[in-house]
Amino acid sequence: MSTFNFDPEVLFRRRRPRVVRSPRFTRIRKILLIVLAVIVVLVIIALALMSLRVNFLYLSSLGHSNVFWTPLIAQVVLFLIGLVLTGALVGVSVPFWSRAVSGIDARAGRITFWTGIAIAVLAGIGGGSHLAGEWQDVLLFLHGHAFGATDPVFHMDYGFYVFTLPVIDGVSALLWGAAVLGLLGACAVVAVSLTIIHAPEEVDVQLHPATGKSVDDALRIGILHAGAALAAIFVLASLGAHFSVYHLATESNSQYSFVGPNATDLNVLIPVLTALQVIALLFAVATIALLVRRSRRRPTWRTVAWLGGLLGGWLILAGALTSIPEAVYTAASVNPNAESAQAKSIDNYLTASRYAWGLQATGSQPSVVNQPFKTVVTPTLNVDLAADPGTLANVRVQDPTQLPAVLNQLDRTRAYQTFDNNITVDRYPNASGQETEVMVGVREIAEGDIPNSNFVNDTFVYTHGYGITAVSVSQIGPEGEPEILDGKEPLQQVQSGAPPALDFDGTGGNPEIYCGEQTSQPVVVNTNQLEFNYPSTPDAYMHAGTQMAGFTINNPFDKLATSISQFGGLNLFLSGIPNSQSKVLINRTVTQRIESIAPFLSVDSDPYIVADPETGDLMWIADAYVETGNFPESDNVNGISYQRNAVKAVVNARTCAVTLYAVDPTEPLTAAWSAIYPGLLHPISQMPSFLVQHLRYPENLFSNQVQVYSQVQVDDQLPVSNPQVASDFFSKNNFYSPSQGLQPDGTAVPTTPQYLELTLPGNPTPQFVLMQTFSPYNSGSGGQASNMTAWLAAESDYTVTDHPPLVAVPLGNNTNVRGPYQFDNNSNTDPAISQQRTLLGESGSQVVLGNVIVLPFNDDSFLFVRPFYVLPNQSSGVSFPQLRYVIVGTQNSVALGTSLPTALEALYNTTSLPAGLNPTTTSPSPSPSPSPSPSPGATPTPSASPTASPPAGGYTPQELAIIGDLVTQEANLKADYASGNLAAAGQAQAAINADISQLSQLLASGGVTLPTPTAASPTPSP
């Protein structure tokens, strides 16, 4: 019997897998990988060069090639500076690393050297990329201007915070990165050296040091290098503590609702940071002294421990000094006396915020003019309202949020055209020269609805929109539609009372719209393919013309670059449709086009279109801002602490040419950018006069100012040093919030600023203003806290001044003035209005309320106006809101009417209205059907006689009596709706339904069947 001998070594012996090697295959694979990598790199470079080339062609076509070269050169130069600076700072450490490691192993020392070089190069690339990304800050630093005003805490010119401090932070980040990398590398060398020196004797460490070197040499060099890097870090920490003091000026103190150093910062943290500057320098000196003292001794772990102790001691000391004294001072001194303790900080915040946001007079900058309001009363019809015919003539009953859907149904004319959601609210002089408020919609190309969408149609044929549509803000058509002043079948006059600037006859002007708010995809014009223009015009197909602000593609590389970078493929490159006269239009969105030639500007979200009264040309105007988040002690809104409407940008809707007008060339940021891009900004004095007449106060700036003003307005008639100011601010006693309104479902939503034509207190001339009402702070729940406490209006007359003022109208705390929320609440609880909403809901219609308009009259009263839209049953998927009613109200009452005059008649219970209020168009009459189209058998408007002649056919006397009653009740129904007497209208409708039911029964016996009537509803018919 054989014996089995088990050998564990055999069981656990590692066996190498059998590998069949193919040297030829390995070489081919390596070559393929290298070729693939080279191709990828070349493709990336080619795509980047194509994008650069197209951008150069585009900017050159606009006459602003410096906008291409200035950022590019700045970024390249800064990248090289960052590359060399960071690479050199890290590269200084490489020889030390290599020499130190050579004392351990000569081959490892050589590897360390090349590895260090690679690290230095990578660090340089990172540093260069970081610095190149700061190109705007660097250019501003080089061209910066003093503000001529200093912050109230550190008394440094505001330009230091805006222009200088960001660059210091950027350079500091590079230095910190290089110092930390050097310290980490030295620490690695020291750690390896100590590990080898103190390795157990039984561990056999095979060392191959360079000739004449040892592990002790490696440790010594590593310690010296680590100490030098640590000393550099202490110096940087000292500088950081110094500049951290200035960063306190932009820190937010949310607990107390202000920005800037608080009481603890001023009295504790700033002195601590000043002390830490000195302490950090002492630590740097101590580190250098330690290195000098121990440089000639044999290095030991004790030296390393000393260095570690210095670093740890600094971290503990800095942390303790910046936290413990603060906590003690806050608890012992600030919290028990917070109001008086924070008074100085509040004063500083109010001073800086009012300056930064243009809420105080600062030379030529906008100022807030406070206009007192008289004791608020209920407006009387023949005194208050009649005293202000300018406001009455422009009461806005049409709502810009609903108008796009209406125009897309009434005046879209083609499926591939659409009206953008941003309706322009503007003013034009009427035939009498009086300023008239209108709303203007722009008929742009609907890029998603182009018929037979393909590359040719999208790029060469359907290239532009066509014309505008203007409507009256105050008139309502017979079926609840807006009164179109111009634009129906584009550029044909419809309403004889249209403002002259909109009174086109279709023979002049350039109505084509190549640049708009929705026009985004690139196109090519002036090609061998005619463009579709408009079917009812003589030029149904056309070429755009040579004046277009596009670029040509006359060589293969330009054509290929444009095809790939802008059109995402080779279709354009392979197409034979473009010719030598063709021009490519890119960046066709108004905002995008402006930002592409002025990357330093932030463009307002609501560009508006203007018609030239002489040529009919259409021009886009967009407000653009210079802004920064580095302004000290100023309120911060969405990361912005300083904002100025620096530029009025004009874009020709047809040619897409852009002109930038500087509102105030002396403003520091504007002046700096003008120096960086000479010739880019033009003085606003060069703007054509017809454009100046349409300039308006910018919406985004005003919205931000409203947010800031709601709290910095506290006691703005008193000096900020007055103790009452800090007291009221601390308690938020006089803080405001934008007023809220109610939606039909009861949801409270903030009101937004509205462009209105009205008369401001102290000025009898109607003006075009941007207005916002305020309620007490944090009054979102409604009730008594939702009263109106103030309103703020921004004038827009740039023909008088380049900086129209803000007009603030505080209403005082002693008067309870109802606000939009309370007006909406009264409307929702009004029996007649509630009944109408219920009836509409039962018929399947939907109520949509427009914006609440608050109109001041005679410096002592307010009138509330809100449009009441009805959406028919939405089963068809078509949105067609129609303005069926207007809700008006005062302090004590509300009323409903089918137009503003009828609503006022119901509100004041009169039929005698002031001159100018009589409707010029037929008021909408409630339709008995929710269908969006007229009923074919609608009852005609009755005559004055309540009886009607029966139709031929031999009706019985009973049938004739019912028919006569039907006619009478129909007349009553229309009269009741016109007067806003909804209760009586409901009774008339019930009588009509009863008559129809009775008549149906009588006629059925004779073989005649009446159509089944639908439930009555005021839903409009288009």
Regions found by a protein language model. Name each.
Residues 3-30, 35-979, 983-1020:
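Soluble extracytoplasmic regions of secretory-pathway and membrane proteins
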